[in-house]
Amino acid sequence: MKIDSFLLKKYLIPLGQKDFIFYCFKRILYNRETDSTILQNNTYSELMTLKTLSNFKPYNSTTKDFSDSADLAADIPGYAVPLNALLKLKSVNRNVDNSRFLNKLLFTAYSFFDEIDTIKQLMYEQYTFQGNNIKNRSSDSVLVDNQLAIPKILKEAESHKVIMINESHYDWRHRYFMTLLLDSLFKKGYKYLCMEDLENEKAINKRKFPTSDDGYYIKEPFMANLARTALHIGYKLIEYEDTTNDIDAYLFNSPVDKREYYQALNLYRQYKKDTTSKWLIYAGYSHINKLRFSLVESSTMAKYFSEFSHVDPYSINQTAYCDIFNTKVAFDSFQNRENYYYLRKNQIDDSTLLKQSDLYIINNIHNIPYEKPDTSKSVQEYHIVYNRKKNEKASYVEVFLKDEYFQNYHAVPIYIKKFSGNILNKNVWLPKNNYNMIVRDESDKIIFQSDLQ
């Protein structure tokens, strides 16, 4: 329910019960349950701050709660402005308890620029990771040269109706892997791609390309290209996020339990419309677990979906051994080329993991594909060249499919790169097409654009 700020201040808060929940924006930025007497004097000012994001200032006197400020910063449209706002928060934050929450938002903001190394550095600054044990490891090397993941998955796909694959929301390599699977799986009968956090399902299926209005994670180029490629092949994209707000929260053990339940229910309602086709479900982290979500949460989307549909999904896990979180996974570089591999069950020394998912993926990918020479007939070399002018604050360059961009200025770039000096001179290898190059400043304003040659 949309509540006018005047009504909220004058009527709902003074007359409300001790505890209530209020919502901000056209979609939920945060839910907060608190004592109405505390909010009475502060809420109106806070809502005014929500309406003036362009003037966002960390620790604004009207946004006293740190998490609210961080959420607001992360949700600002664009790429450079939200990242810079979060970095400002980080520079003034002295509270250890806030750091973990803030870093999660920073990881996502950096992921939009596909900066895995920066994310890893932030991770290592904050945590000491202890990776899962892998048997038969010699000098911390994993010998998986003959264990290529894609052929294994395609073989398993023949005998399953539903495949669930997870990702880290910070890792473009997981989205690229999913994209590599799409064409072959489509030929095996998989017709639907269900994506976490997807919005505007009807619009994107009709438009046939993604925009930044279609979800939060889809702003990242590889996630956008996953959706774009699926639509081009012939998949129908399905949204399944829980949008029930907190109307019936009392029925569930926790917010996690509620979200897992409704995600699964939304998937099942779609699935039962076409049980003859096969389905791909793409989700983050623990949603695809078959045993439990975490040490303290037993419910998962995969478990609920199985209960509703009586279908046992084939669960593929990319996060348990992801090198962003796990420092114990290393490859024998003399035997393994850049590729995606899977672990045999006798290589996993963790009985819980064996129950959580059916297959564990590790990747030996280090370079963004577009930045590597490619002699394929369908690929062409393009040149990105831009010299910063004096006193110019050029921040990053975007490359758009020209047709998409001029149909909708909210189209998502196929490639994005931050400036690291005064000159950006880079060759990229992209599918043959017409592209538009745009350079933006620190305020996400366009300062230069041209066709990409």
Residue ranges of predicted features:
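Compositional signal for N-terminal targeting/processing segments
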Residues: I3-Q453
